[in-house]
């Protein structure tokens, strides 16, 4: 007991002495030197925390948006040698039985060419104003529950179930938002809400009104022409209900890995690929994230070394220029 009291008294005394010496040093110190040291330490701290956070956060933000709006926690897609998910209705029924299932959306996909001046006569050798685009077929109600895509419509309005003659178009397909003119890369000019465009898939073409323009920062929407799923099936000559992707959202009661294992055990792996969001992220995105992490650590390390040297020089110069020294 006596030893404990002695330790506590010694600790209290040390704190009091340290506090007294600190106040005394601050009173006698050069205010500019102290300010410089505090500033360097603050900037060093910000460099360690903020720079790494910004570099990694840029990619993390893209991944989070991709996961939230495009692929969910689990994504089911066609095998690489197939064009669609086989037995899609059966797969959807299995998806709804996942413990922790919250929501899903079924999307039909394809590649299309969109033209805006198809009614005009062009001179020999000229190209029509057109662009290649991904074709995305959705159920408007189902997709809205999943991704809330209507909030990304920056002009015009969202699709409803009766809009068989209307489409949404991603901003990256429009010259107004992507003013790039390069060989092999075309965007649509003079296209706005209410314009008529022609969408062509192979030998099948149809005219549509542009009902809205999408800006989501997710390529799934920004580089796509979005139409009703029935229209995409018609354009791609698909006579069944086999879809391109099924994105699934889960609640917190189950992990994506557990949900993936459940789907594979239920036989979904026979019809399509089953991936977690982490598996589905493009490799280049993972490589960029890792590179930015290394770059952030290197910058922070260099900043720490420079700050340490700077503070040492400031303190050393301040010490040797003092008039009075204690114990010297």
Role assignments for model-derived ranges:
Residues 46-134, 141-144, 155-158, 163:
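Hydrophobic, regular-secondary-structure patches
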Residues 145-150, 237-238:
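Short, charged, solvent-exposed linker or helix-capping segments at domain edges/interfaces
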Residues 30-35, 257-309, 318-322, 328:
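Peri-transmembrane interface segments
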Residues 154-157, 168-275:
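Basic-flanked hydrophobic alpha-helices used for secretion and membrane insertion
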Residues 20, 24, 28, 60, ...:
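Short amphipathic alpha-helical coupling elements at transmembrane boundaries
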Residues 1-49:
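N-terminal Sec/SRP start-transfer signal
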Residues 43-54, 303-311:
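Hydrophobic alpha-helical membrane-associated segments
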């Amino acid at each position: 007991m006596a030893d404990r009291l002695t330790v506590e008294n010694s600790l209290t005394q040390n704190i009091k002495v340290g506090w007294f010496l600190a106040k005394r040093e601050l009173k006698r110190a050069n205010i500019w030197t102290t300010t410089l040291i505090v500033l360097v330490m603050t900037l060093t701290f910000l460099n360690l925390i903020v720079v790494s956070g910004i570099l990694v956060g840029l990619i993390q933000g893209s991944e989070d948006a991709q996961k939230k709006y495009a692929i969910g926690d689990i994504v089911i897609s066609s095998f690489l040698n197939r064009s669609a998910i086989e037995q899609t209705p059966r797969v959807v029924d299995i998806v709804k039985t996942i413990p922790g299932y919250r929501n899903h959306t079924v999307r039909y996909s394809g590649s299309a060419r969109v033209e805006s001046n198809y009614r005009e006569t062009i001179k020999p050798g000229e190209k029509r104003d057109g662009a290649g685009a991904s074709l995305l077929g959705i159920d408007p109600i189902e997709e809205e529950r999943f991704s809330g895509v209507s909030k990304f419509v920056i002009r015009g309005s969202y699709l409803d179930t009766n809009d068989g003659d209307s489409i949404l178009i991603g901003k990256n397909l429009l010259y107004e938002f992507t003013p790039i003119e390069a060989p092999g890369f075309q965007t649509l000019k003079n296209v706005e809400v209410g314009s008529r465009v022609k969408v062509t898939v192979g030998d099948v073409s149809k005219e549509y009104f542009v009902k809205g323009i999408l800006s989501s920062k997710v390529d799934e929407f920004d580089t796509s022409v979005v139409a009703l799923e029935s229209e995409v099936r018609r354009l791609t000559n698909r006579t069944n209900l086999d879809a391109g992707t099924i994105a699934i959202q889960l609640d917190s009661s189950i992990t994506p890995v557990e949900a993936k294992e459940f789907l594979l055990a239920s036989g979904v792996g026979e019809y399509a690929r089953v991936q977690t969001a982490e598996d589905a992220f493009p490799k280049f995105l993972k490589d960029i994230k890792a590179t930015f992490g290394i770059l952030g650590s290197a910058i922070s390390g260099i900043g720490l070394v420079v700050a340490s040297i700077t503070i040492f020089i400031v303190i050393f110069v301040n010490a040797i220029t003092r008039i009075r020294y204690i114990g010297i």
